[in-house]
């Protein structure tokens, strides 16, 4: 969890270093830089997302490539389906142009389910062992048999994909990836991220499970920091259907969660204001979220 923040702190350090003479900023230079930016049009992002497999990565990413063909092919196909749920170009604008698939993905030696490169348009995702066979399994949920990934949704690739894409939209959308007082102001007065109010050694607690055990949050993991809080809200909106089905209940019972959902949807609509998204699942999900949490 803390490893992801290292990427962002590296950016912050570079910004501080570049602004040592902060009182000598040339406004004409800033205007010139702004004019160099291309217009924000959908056609600027009209290209395919690249799914990268069997390709080593450099420090600080350790990308194990020993996944089975069955697992990596299944994950890649599931990823293609996820990309197709969004308007064409959405992932490109989100700086998620390259998706690297690894087995046992590690960042600085720490295992990660996924990670975003804050400087380059890359997302790294870990392919779980046996994911292809798990997708065809049926398990008993207490009353009937259901698909393994529907019941154990934390193993569903759609969970980590939607979570990491939210991270990528956030860091592309604005600098609130570093500081976000407006978001933090939605929490209960006095709340501090990192004080989870639970024992991390208690293995009976699944920090990724969707629950409202801590008011204002959709999972224990969301209480880690504002970045993970935002990503978990995005995941509930766009993640597995089993998770999304809980959105109405969460919003009806928790005004803070409802406010976070509304803020996220508003930001996403501003991020992708272009025509042509009407028939995408992304549009359907955010429209439903507005109704459920309005």
Can you describe what each PLM-predicted range is?
Residues 1-16:
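Sec-dependent bacterial lipoprotein signal peptides
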Residues 12, 57, 286-287:
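Processing junctions and N-termini across compartments
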Residues 15-53, 289, 293:
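Bacterial Sec-dependent N-terminal signal peptides
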Residues 31-33, 76, 80, 265, ...:
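Residue-level detector of alpha-helical secondary structure
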Residues 54-64, 240-241:
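Beta-strand-rich recognition domains
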């Amino acid at each position: 969890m803390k490893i992801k923040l290292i990427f962002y702190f590296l950016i912050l350090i570079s910004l501080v270093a570049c602004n040592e003479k902060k009182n000598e900023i040339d406004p004409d230079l800033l205007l010139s830089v702004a004019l160099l930016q291309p217009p924000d049009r959908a056609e600027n992002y009209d290209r395919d997302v690249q799914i990268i497999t069997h390709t080593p990565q450099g420090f600080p990413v350790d990308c194990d490539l020993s996944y089975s063909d069955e697992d990596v092919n299944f994950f890649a196909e599931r990823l293609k389906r996820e990309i197709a749920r969004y308007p064409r170009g959405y992932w490109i604008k989100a700086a998620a142009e390259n998706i690297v698939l690894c087995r046992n993905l590690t960042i600085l030696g720490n295992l990660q389910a996924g990670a975003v490169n804050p400087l380059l348009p890359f997302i790294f995702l870990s392919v779980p062992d046996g994911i292809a066979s798990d997708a065809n399994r049926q398990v008993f949920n207490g009353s009937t048999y259901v698909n393994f990934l529907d019941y154990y949704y934390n193993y569903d690739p759609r969970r980590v994909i939607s979570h990491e894409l939210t991270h990528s939209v956030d860091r592309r959308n604005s600098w609130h990836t570093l500081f976000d007082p407006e978001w933090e102001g939605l929490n209960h007065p006095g709340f501090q991220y990192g004080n989870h109010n639970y024992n991390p050694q208690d293995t009976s607690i699944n920090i990724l499970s969707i629950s409202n055990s801590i008011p204002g949050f959709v999972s224990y993991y969301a209480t880690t920091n504002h970045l993970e809080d935002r990503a978990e809200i995005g995941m509930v909106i766009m993640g597995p259907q089993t998770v999304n089905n809980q959105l109405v209940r969460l919003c009806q019972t928790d005004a803070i969660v409802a406010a976070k959902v509304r803020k996220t949807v508003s930001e996403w609509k501003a991020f992708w204001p272009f025509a042509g998204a009407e028939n995408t699942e992304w549009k359907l999900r955010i429209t439903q979220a507005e109704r459920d949490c309005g």
